[in-house]
Regions:
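Terminal membrane/secretory targeting segments in land-plant proteins
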Residues: 492-580
């Protein structure tokens, strides 16, 4: 057994390994080996069962041993710089392997059909390479023990599986980020233990099969970014499905009967489709729902009051629909990073999200996933027909990061309670009928990076301190009675008596700006004066002159030894990241 993972910096394979013949486990991960894969490592150690070379800088092809290696069980060479073709006979020379991870390399060409000889294989991960062609039929027949098949982010094409299919124990199938065509194969119905099915970012067409809703173990279904069409399936959920991603397809029809019964849902993403009708009242029974993404559809009617029953919501996106009526004062949005199972909060236990979700932040659509999504919360109700006042209760969402209510018909004033949105980064209230002034309390929002109230009926002076000093004219345009920086007008233009002179107006208009030339000149004079005072003190007082030179000498020595001590570390750091 040899385990050097992350403990030393080798740069090359340790030479003593060439003389080892009885090793059963070798773990040389994360030590930045930078050379080709040595065939003698497998050839010499015929008893080797576990080989881990994760996250190094290995390059060239993966060389097989000269003879069959019947003891190797786990092979992980992920996150390296391997290139070329995967050896066509890999399944013949390594017939008893149970775990193969070759992801994150530069392998190209087709997937060898000899993988089908690995009858004990349980996990095959070839994701994030440059593989092309189709999935070999022999792989789907011979790998009878396969539990995880991960081929994401390659250039694979053709039908997903042929009719001949024998992966009965398959639990996780990830084929996202390829060029697969055709419909979802009915043969997947035989995978009764399937928990994760990710076919996103392909060219799959047809309808959503009814039998997907009958797969009792299915937890994650991702069919987003395809060409799937037809109506939403009725009575779809008879399972414990938790995450459902169907965005950016051509789905249509009503939500009325589509997902009733999916009471374990955490994620429901139907954005960028042609969904019609209203949001059904039974949405309030989805007590675990954290992410409700229904933007860019044709949903109409009012926002149902039952939505307020969803206490776990982190992201709500109902934008670009035809919703009407008032904004519910009871809407909630809470970051998952603080929530525990009992409803209390714990910052150390975020909910991990592996699949990305699109959400518009700071006027740009971003994809959030993983821990970042777990710490993120927001509400987007923009581009609808919402009316009435903005509820003051919205100001109680002190964990929300994004609030977008733009392009509606909202009236009334901006609630002063928005000053309680301590985590807010983007606040968009543009294109409404809001009136009154911008509450001065909003200057306490220290994380506010985007603020937009353009094209309303606001009046009064624009706050010009803290974050508000960073917003440009586009944040306020279209409000006739707003004045102050950064708008090129002053309140005196509206209410100034006739006796006031034009010179007075111009002086007040220019009060927002600083003469750069005067600033630079005054700064230079001040700087020179400070230097002259210091020089005069040192010349007159011998004691201070001695202290000053002593301080200079000590500082110079400290800087010198700091650079010498850290130079080796910096050189090593640059070398470690050379291949990345």
């Amino acid at each position: 057994m040899l385990i050097l993972s992350g403990r030393v910096y080798c740069g090359a394979f340790p030479k003593f390994l060439y003389h080892q013949y009885n090793l059963q486990l070798v773990d040389l991960s994360h030590i930045q080996i930078k050379e080709g894969f040595p065939s003698w490592l497998l050839h010499n150690n015929t008893k080797l069962e576990f080989l881990y070379l994760i996250n190094n800088s290995l390059s060239g092809p993966l060389q097989l041993p000269l003879y069959f290696h019947t003891n190797l069980s786990n092979l992980d060479i992920s996150d390296n710089c391997f290139q070329g073709y995967i050896a066509p006979m890999i399944g013949t020379y390594l017939p008893r392997v149970r775990y193969v991870n070759m992801s994150g390399n530069g392998f190209r060409g087709s997937i060898p059909s000899s993988f089908g000889n690995m009858s004990l294989l349980q996990t095959l991960d070839l994701s994030n390479n440059k593989l092309s062609g189709s999935i070999p039929e022999y792989l789907t027949i011979g790998c009878i023990s396969l539990v995880e098949l991960i081929l994401s982010n390659n250039s694979l094409q053709g039908q997903i599986f042929s009719r001949t299919f024998n992966l009965r124990f398959l639990g996780e199938l990830q084929l996202d980020g390829n060029q697969f065509t055709g419909s979802i194969p009915h043969s997947l119905f035989n995978c009764t233990f399937l928990r994760v099915l990710d076919l996103s970012h392909n060219d799959i067409s047809g309808k959503i099969p009814w039998w997907l809703g009958d797969m009792s173990y299915l937890e994650i279904l991702d069919l987003s970014m395809n060409n799937i069409s037809g109506n939403l399936p009725s009575n779809f959920c008879h399972t414990n499905i938790q995450k459902l991603y169907l965005s950016r397809n051509g789905l249509q029809g009503s939500l009325k009967d589509a997902f009733y019964g999916c009471f374990e849902l955490i994620v429901l993403d139907l954005s960028h489709n042609n969904v019609t009708g209203s949001i059904p009242p039974w949405i309030g029974k989805f007590s675990q729902l954290s992410y409700l993404i229904l933007g860019h559809n044709n949903i109409e009617a009012k926002i149902p009051i039952q939505l307020c029953n969803l206490t776990q919501l982190s992201l709500i996106d109902l934008s670009h629909n035809h919703l009407s009526g008032p904004i519910l004062p009871c809407l909630r949005s809470t970051s998952n990073s603080y929530r525990q199972q009992d409803g209390s909060y714990n910052a150390s236990a975020p909910v991990s999200m592996d699949e990305p979700l699109e959400f518009t932040t700071k006027s740009i659509s971003y994809s959030y996933q993983g821990s970042m999504l777990s710490y993120f919360s927001g509400i987007d109700l923009s581009c609808n027909h919402l009316t009435g006042r903005i509820p003051t209760e919205i100001g109680n969402l002190n964990e929300i990061h994004v609030l977008n209510l733009s392009h509606n018909s909202l009236t009334g004033e901006i609630p002063a309670s928005f000053s309680n949105l301590h985590q807010i980064e983007s606040l968009d209230l543009s294109y409404n009928n809001l009136k009154g002034s911008i509450p001065s309390q909003l200057t306490e929002l220290n994380f506010l990076a985007v603020f937009n109230v353009s094209y309303n009926n606001l009046s009064g002076k624009i706050p010009d301190v803290k974050q508000f000093a960073t917003f440009d004219e586009s944040s306020y345009r279209g409000n006739l009675f707003l004045y102050g920086c950064p708008l090129m007008k002053n309140c005196t233009e509206i209410s100034l008596p006739p006796s006031k002179s034009r010179t007075s107006i111009e002086n007040k208009e220019s009060s927002c700006f600083i003469d750069k030339d005067a600033f630079h000149a005054s700064f230079g004079v001040t700087y020179i004066m400070v230097l002259l005072v210091i020089a005069a003190v040192l010349y007159i007082n011998p004691y201070w002159r001695q202290v000053w030179f002593y301080y200079i000498e000590v500082s110079t020595n400290n800087c010198y030894y700091f650079i010498i001590d850290n130079l080796a570390f910096l050189s090593k750091f640059r070398f470690c990241n050379f291949c990345k």
